[in-house]
């Protein structure tokens, strides 16, 4: 039975330390945590899929920003926090850009349809 063998738990613990102590995994967990905090503090109650999409976007941006912050600043302790913060700000800007882009396309298409009727 694996519960009574301490070697199994030692292997599990060493795997967790090896794989979850990387800055990318920490950034992904921070992104999910920040997204859940945002979900809790917002007055609107978005669907859980939007929270997960927001966390995935934040984690992907943070995954790119963490090695850059580590290279520029040299502090591995603060790079996951800075990367997550950059990822969170990045998701807001990406969302604003997409809404502006979609609204422009809709207005442009509406104007083109109106001109073709004349």
From Swiss-Prot:
Lineage: Bacteria, Pseudomonadati, Pseudomonadota, Gammaproteobacteria, Pasteurellales
Name this protein carries in UniProt: Uncharacterized protein HI_1416
Keywords annotated in UniProt: Signal
Matching InterPro entries: Phage_lambda_GpS_holin
Keyword Signal in annotation: yes
Pfam name, any one: Phage_holin_3_1
Origin species: Haemophilus influenzae (strain ATCC 51907 / DSM 11121 / KW20 / Rd)
Signal peptide: 1-27
Domain of life, per lineage: Bacteria
